């Protein structure tokens, strides 16, 4: 058993989970602000060190990236659609900010707990470490190295938390005797003296007389636990400043190391051969050049981006390979040099995201250049019964493309260029899949590295188990670009214009209606083929008042866009696009 504790002493510091420790000494309160600061600084160091290590092992091991990816995986489709519609291309940024805010809140709470009971604070760190490890190791393309940043950050966090908690509790553990009184005796041998620390307590606790701080004005019987500890402010400030500096340097150095893996220079120096099969120039009148109308060719910088990548994969051309395997007679593996030596094909193709709402922005048209996927599959020899190409990205994302859609004669490409330049990194550099006529989640795998020829019964792409359809042909739709309803119109002749699409079928007609009036035929622009959207315009003699404009398209099969309103899930939105306008 430990030595009996001297009567009349209490602890100032972090020693017990209750108001008094097992020996009866009171545990005072550490100011809450010190706890909040302890938690936030600890979290900052953990993130900074983890970022530094992730710059070496790979950015996908960053805890924020890993947790963000896991959050995307677990996000229900309605919430995903809301995020895309509300934040657009900034949805990933909003997600990361949200993760950091939640981290700060919980870190502050853990810090408040830690200055009262260090072991509880360390337990909180252990929980966060476990979450980070599970997120890092559960990613589709993860490996053991992805756990290293999380573990390194956790180790640094433990060291910082311990030092800050001790500083918050006071610098030196000392014992003080009550004031001498006549007849008072010196401590007996074996009892703690003035410079001894009673056993069973953590370093950092300060020992003072139980009556200390209770002057004549103190109420009789006041509990010592009501006293507030006196942190070593200087020590806390020094330790905290050093920790913040470490966090900042780690974050900046980690970012610099990550940027070293950028493929921007490799992309700029990549030579793309001329296509063997070029498309004719755009026919006259393909672009109506109406102010506010989407241009026929979407610039790369304006092309929509919807994917699951928190950070853009940086795939070096020299290390890229594509494997074609599964239900084939001959497995194929191609490097980028080998792919570029194949006959290359150009094609104008409009891509559409299945998350696009009626009249939404997640659609774009580009001139793609690449190798024919059908040609490669014929070389591999597809076995009877194969129905799906399960395509995998370098970051583990998968999409399931119907074999029939690739082999029916359409220009399904392993694209290497977009609008005359190598693919932008955000759009799949160095190679992506482009299959006309299908929504992007089953036809446009970016950063593609693997094609498994299989069946829909044996494998599912990423979004299918999350509630989206296996088969996803693009629906016949239209959009009104101008007028947009943002400003009043003048009475008189007004150009109502927009785009319509029915990829791999083609648009044959677009009609416009004002309020409940009759449908009016719009004039269609020329197109180079059936795989692109089509511009249209209708001249309206606008009359004063409030009006609603509607549009509908008819494709080359005779199908007319439905008025039935449906959300994007599970296979694309439907309904008429409408614009409310005021004419003065």
Residue ranges and their predicted role:
Residues 20-23, 167-227:
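Intrinsically disordered, low-complexity terminal tails and inter-domain linkers enriched
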Residues 30, 34, 38, 42, ...:
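Alpha-helical transmembrane segments of integral membrane proteins
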Residues 93-182:
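Membrane-embedded alpha-helical segments of integral membrane proteins
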Residues 227, 245-247, 252, 259:
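Extended acidic/polar, glycine-enriched regions
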Residues 56-60, 90, 116-117, 167, ...:
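Membrane-interface elements of multi-pass transporters and channels
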Residues 222-244:
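N-terminal secretory signal peptides and thylakoid transit peptides that target proteins
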Residues 104-105, 118-119, 141-145, 163, ...:
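Structured, non-membrane catalytic/scaffold regions adjacent to prosthetic-group chemistry
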Residues 1-119:
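Membrane-anchoring hydrophobic segments
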């Amino acid at each position: 058993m430990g030595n009996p504790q001297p009567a009349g002493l209490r602890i100032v510091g972090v020693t017990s989970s209750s108001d008094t420790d097992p020996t009866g000494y009171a545990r005072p309160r550490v100011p809450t602000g010190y706890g909040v600061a302890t938690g936030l600084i600890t979290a900052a160091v953990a993130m900074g060190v983890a970022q530094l290590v992730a710059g070496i092992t790979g950015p996908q091991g960053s805890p924020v990236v890993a947790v963000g990816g896991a959050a995307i995986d677990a996000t229900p489709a309605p919430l995903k659609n809301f995020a895309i519609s509300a934040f657009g291309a900034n949805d990933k940024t909003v997600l990361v900010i949200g993760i950091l805010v939640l981290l700060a809140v919980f870190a502050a709470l853990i810090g408040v707990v830690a200055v009262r009971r260090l072991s509880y604070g360390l337990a909180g760190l252990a929980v966060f470490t476990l979450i980070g490890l599970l997120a890092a190791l559960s990613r589709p393309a993860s490996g053991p190295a992805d756990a290293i940043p999380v573990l390194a950050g956790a180790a640094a966090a433990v060291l910082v938390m311990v030092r800050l908690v001790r500083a918050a509790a006071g610098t030196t553990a000392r014992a003080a005797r009550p004031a001498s009184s006549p007849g008072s005796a010196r401590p007996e041998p074996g009892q703690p003296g003035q410079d001894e620390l009673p056993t069973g307590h953590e370093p950092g606790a300060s020992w003072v007389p139980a009556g200390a701080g209770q002057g004549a004005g103190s109420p009789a019987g006041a509990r010592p636990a009501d006293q507030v500890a006196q942190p070593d402010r200087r020590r806390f400030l020094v330790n905290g400043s050093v920790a913040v500096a470490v966090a900042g340097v780690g974050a900046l150095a980690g970012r610099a190391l990550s940027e070293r893996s950028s493929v921007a220079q490799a992309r700029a120096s990549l030579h793309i051969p001329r296509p063997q099969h070029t498309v004719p120039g755009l026919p006259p009148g393909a672009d109506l050049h109406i102010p506010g109308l989407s241009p026929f060719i979407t610039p790369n910088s304006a092309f929509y981006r919807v994917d699951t990548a928190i950070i853009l994969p940086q795939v070096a051309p020299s290390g890229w390979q594509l494997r074609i395997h599964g239900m084939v007679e001959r497995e194929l593996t191609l490097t980028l040099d080998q792919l570029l030596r194949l006959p290359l094909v150009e094609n104008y193709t409009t891509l559409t995201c299945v998350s696009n709402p009626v009249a939404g922005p997640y659609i774009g048209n580009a001139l793609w250049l690449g190798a024919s996927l059908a040609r490669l599959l014929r070389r591999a020899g597809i076995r009877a019964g194969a129905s799906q190409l399960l395509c995998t990205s370098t970051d583990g994302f998968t999409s399931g493309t119907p074999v029939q859609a690739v082999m029916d004669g359409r220009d399904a490409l392993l694209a290497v260029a977009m609008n005359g330049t190598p693919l932008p990194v955000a759009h799949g550099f160095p190679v992506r899949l482009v299959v006309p006529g299908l929504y992007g989640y089953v036809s446009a795998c970016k950063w593609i590295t693997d094609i498994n020829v299989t069946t829909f019964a044996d494998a599912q792409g990423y979004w299918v188990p999350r509630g989206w359809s296996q088969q996803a042909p693009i629906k016949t739709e239209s959009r009104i670009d101008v007028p947009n309803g943002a400003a009043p119109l003048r009475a008189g002749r007004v150009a109502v214009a927009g785009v319509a699409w029915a990829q791999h079928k083609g648009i044959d007609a677009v009609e416009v209606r004002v309020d409940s009036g009759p449908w009016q035929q719009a004039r269609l622009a020329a197109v180079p083929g059936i795989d692109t959207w089509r511009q249209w315009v209708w001249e309206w003699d606008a009359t004063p008042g409030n009006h609603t404009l509607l549009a509908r398209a008819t494709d080359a099969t005779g199908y007319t866009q439905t008025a039935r309103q449906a959300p994007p899930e599970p296979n694309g939105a439907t309904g008429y696009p409408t614009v409310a306008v005021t004419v003065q």
